[in-house]
A protein has these predicted regions:
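Conserved catalytic residues of ABC-type ATPase nucleotide-binding domains
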Residues: 1-106
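Outer-membrane beta-barrel strand-turn architecture
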Residues: 14, 56-60, 150-152, 170, ...
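Outer-envelope beta-barrel architecture signal
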Residues: 14-20, 60-64, 136-140, 154-160, ...
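Membrane-embedded beta-strand positions of outer-membrane beta-barrel proteins
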Residues: 20-24, 66, 144, 160-162, ...
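Transmembrane beta-strands of outer-membrane beta-barrel pores
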Residues: 24-32, 70-74, 150, 164-172, ...
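Outer-membrane beta-barrel translocator domains and adjoining extracellular loop/strand segments
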Residues: 32-38, 77-83, 172-179, 223-229
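Membrane-embedded beta-strand positions in outer-membrane beta-barrel channels/transporters
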Residues: 49-51, 141-145, 193-197, 236
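Outer-membrane beta-barrel "beta-signal"
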Residues: 231-243
Length: 243
């Protein structure tokens, strides 16, 4: 009888196995390893995310889900040294720094050459300027998650979610002092990662729920050969309907 009761308690209404949600939120890409770009520390950068997802409940405790999400990974680097193409003497083919791997810009724009701190010290060139470098990589992501219900009473519920995702790069921008200077040539077209989140949900009307969801994302390979903020905090708000 006890086993039968547990099985009955674990069953879910067949009319509510599926749920579709829309959501939007804010995110912050963080530098957790004190990584540097061109000798300068990568700073955190805030962005927005939004998407749609569907979930299938196996029973009252477990569910699986997937969907599509637009998300942006970014970083800011202050006091980056660079030389403008207007300084024609520096871009002369005879200049040894122009071909230096250390001095190669991570931007596709040939009007600017971003240089490391060590190269700047070696050059001691009056044409060297400093500015703020912002890099933004936007992806369309497809997650695959498993959810476990840790609390479900009356109209409120709390779920823990974990899984992985694959993302396709759809936007790649590098800005210097607020002006677009091209793309990061080291960005990978596809990115992979893991995600962990908690969904706090409240039923507002029959099968309609609102939710808030703090989350953590980790990106494995945003760039080929450069450091980049790989850890991201997120906070999503959304609405879902079960059927």
């Amino acid at each position: 009888k006890k086993e039968e009761k547990e099985k009955k308690d674990n069953l879910i209404d067949t009319k509510e196995r599926w749920a579709v949600a829309v959501f939007a939120g804010v995110a912050s890409s963080e530098n957790t390893k004190n990584e540097k770009t061109l000798g300068n520390v990568n700073d955190s950068k805030q962005s927005n995310s939004y998407g749609v997802r569907t979930k299938y409940s196996i029973n009252k405790k477990w569910a699986v889900g997937s969907g599509l999400k637009i998300n942006e990974l970014g970083q800011s680097v202050a006091n980056v040294s660079y030389v403008s193409a207007k300084s024609n003497a520096f871009f002369n083919s005879g200049n040894s720094y122009a071909d230096s791997p250390v001095a190669v810009a991570n931007s596709s724009n040939q009007e600017y050459l971003l240089i490391s701190n060590s190269t700047k010290e070696a050059m001691k060139n009056e044409n060297v300027q400093t500015g703020k470098l912002d890099q933004n990589l936007r992806y369309i992501e497809m997650p695959l998650e498993v959810s476990y219900s840790v609390f479900n009473k009356n109209k409120a519920s709390i779920n823990l979610n974990t899984g992985g995702f694959v993302g396709k790069l759809i936007s790649n921008n590098v800005n210097l002092d607020g002006h677009t200077i091209g793309e990061n040539t080291n960005a990978n077209d596809y990115v992979y990662g893991s995600t962990l989140s908690s969904t706090v949900q409240y039923r507002v009307y029959k099968k309609t729920n609102v939710f808030i969801e703090p989350a953590m994302n980790y990106y494995i390979n945003p760039l080929n050969s450069q450091s980049f903020n790989q850890f991201q905090w997120g906070l999503n708000f959304g609405l879902n309907v079960s059927f």
